[in-house]
């Protein structure tokens, strides 16, 4: 049985962490996020190719971010079901719902509201506020569908680790 209060809290915090990391990445490593924008916005941003040092910092940032996000997902799932038997399906559903919650926040709040509708400078590539692609809702919906697949795969991997850890701690 899912621990709904813990799941809701995990979804909110995880989505806020993702939003923070996306904003930081866009400010400090925009070339790492350019593929998440329509082609005309990528062209208008005219981002220079990253130097080897910038690539290294981007890789370190991404590794740290994913380590934090995945550790948070595993830890909150372990805490949500501590002291009670939880099946693999329960672990997977908890993690999958966390992933889908972020994916929905990414589409509805970040992409459609902050980028497409409001044009928030915090989430736009440099020099792209004027681009027609800024209002390309379809582009972001396709990204959402890809995110559903990616989050399903990631959730399965995290569920294997989490479920294994649960059984080792018994």
What are these regions (language model features)?
Residues 1-97, 101-170:
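Juxtamembrane/disordered regions of integral membrane proteins
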């Amino acid at each position: 049985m899912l621990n709904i209060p813990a799941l809701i809290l995990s979804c909110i915090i995880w989505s806020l962490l993702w939003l923070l990391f996306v904003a930081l990445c866009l400010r400090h490593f925009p070339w790492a996020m350019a593929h998440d924008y329509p082609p005309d916005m990528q062209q208008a941003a005219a981002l220079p190719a990253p130097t080897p040092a910038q690539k290294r910092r981007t890789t370190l940032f991404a590794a740290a971010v994913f380590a934090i996000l995945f550790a948070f997902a595993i830890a909150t799932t372990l805490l949500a079901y501590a002291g009670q038997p939880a099946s693999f399906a329960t672990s997977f559903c908890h993690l999958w719902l966390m992933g889908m919650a972020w994916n929905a926040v990414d589409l509805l709040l970040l992409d459609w509201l902050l980028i497409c509708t409001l044009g928030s400078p915090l989430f736009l590539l440099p020099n792209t506020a004027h681009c027609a692609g800024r209002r390309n809702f379809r582009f972001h919906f396709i990204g959402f569908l890809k995110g559903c697949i990616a989050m399903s795969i990631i959730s399965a991997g995290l569920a294997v680790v989490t479920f294994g850890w649960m059984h080792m701690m018994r």
